């Protein structure tokens, strides 16, 4: 049986406040490790509601420095210190954020008893930024109004396993390899026609994609103007990537009911879901 590989949705709204959604944030749970992606305002409250322990977070990945993706970071890091965290925490974020982050760290976190290690990212190229025995995390260059990248979480292949059957001439029978699962977080970006093909080339096994879907077709001009994507465009990426499933998110506040977004995406790629706060999705 495959070990857990899950995505916890903490926030799936966009920049303007909404009664129904929180700003962007997710937790990726893989093989007992927990990684946060983006940290919009109020994220630490959502973590409490998710029942994921603060102490289990190893690293935080920031896709870009817009407030709805980063305004919750300092408050949460301060809470970690108040809780007595001593384990180091790794922050991966676009390089131009480092100067401001260090200023905020000096002002708000100077008395904390745990180390915070900042890893500056080059958002213009794909590169492996984290690796352990079972996992790699790679950047996905995106196209937004500020430097921005997504993140590709991918399992490493496991060693081949054998089934012992003493009734056969050759008692060790090789078992089929376990498919390598992957999760692609595609944050704020305009539609990139080559993105799906790139993901398909990197992910031969089951692939789940989260792709921003700020607008429906009725606001496609806004998507182009503000460098966002429509739900249909997100589905085009998933179809091109031959993905297993697509999670929509980053909904504009103008849509009180996101069913319109879902319907337009499913016209192109049927295994599409509306991500929702509090939901946990298997990869």
Model-flagged regions — what are they?
Residues 37-40, 57-65, 69, 94, ...:
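Active-site neighborhood of phospho(di)ester-bond hydrolases with catalytic His/Asp-centered motifs
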Residues 2-50, 86, 151-153, 160, ...:
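Conserved beta-strand hairpin/beta-sheet module of binuclear metal-dependent hydrolase folds
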Residues 27, 122-249, 257-270:
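Metal-dependent phosphodiesterase/nuclease catalytic metal-binding core
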Residues 85-89, 95-122, 254:
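Active-site neighborhood of divalent metal-dependent phosphoester bond hydrolases
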Residues 73-80, 256-264:
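Metal-dependent catalytic neighborhoods of phosphoester/phosphodiester hydrolases
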Residues 31, 57, 83-88, 240-247:
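Short, surface-exposed connector motifs at secondary-structure boundaries
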Residues 8, 92, 117-122, 138-140, ...:
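General small-molecule cofactor/ligand-binding pocket signal
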Residues 41-92, 120-122:
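Active-site metal-binding motif and surrounding structural segment of the metallo-beta-lactamase
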């Amino acid at each position: 049986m495959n070990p857990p590989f899950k995505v916890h949705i903490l926030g799936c709204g966009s920049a303007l406040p909404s009664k129904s959604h929180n700003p962007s944030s997710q937790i990726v749970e893989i093989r007992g490790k927990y990684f946060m992606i983006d940290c919009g305002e109020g994220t630490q409250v959502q973590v409490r509601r998710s029942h994921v322990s603060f102490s289990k977070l190893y690293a935080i990945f920031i896709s870009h420095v817009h407030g709805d993706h980063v305004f919750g970071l300092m408050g949460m890091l301060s809470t970690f210190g108040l809780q007595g965290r001593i384990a180091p925490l790794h922050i991966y974020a676009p390089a131009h954020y480092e100067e401001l982050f260090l200023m905020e760290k000096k002002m708000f976190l100077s008395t904390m008893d745990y180390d915070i290690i900042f890893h500056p990212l080059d958002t213009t190229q794909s590169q492996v930024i984290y690796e352990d025995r079972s996992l790699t995390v790679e950047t996905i260059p995106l196209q937004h109004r500020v430097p921005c990248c997504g993140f590709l979480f991918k399992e490493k292949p496991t060693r081949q396993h054998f089934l012992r059957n003493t009734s056969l001439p050759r008692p060790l029978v090789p078992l089929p390899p376990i498919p390598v699962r992957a999760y692609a977080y595609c944050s704020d970006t305009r539609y990139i026609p080559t993105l799906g093909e790139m993901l398909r080339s990197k992910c031969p096994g089951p692939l789940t994609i989260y792709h921003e879907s700020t607008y429906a077709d009725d606001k496609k001009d806004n998507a182009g103007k503000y460098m966002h994507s429509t739900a249909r465009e997100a589905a085009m990426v998933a179809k091109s990537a031959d993905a297993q499933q697509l999670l929509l998110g980053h909904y504009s506040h103008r849509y009180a009911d996101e069913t319109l977004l879902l319907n337009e995406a499913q016209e192109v790629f049927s295994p599409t879901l509306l991500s929702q706060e509090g939901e946990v999705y298997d990869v």
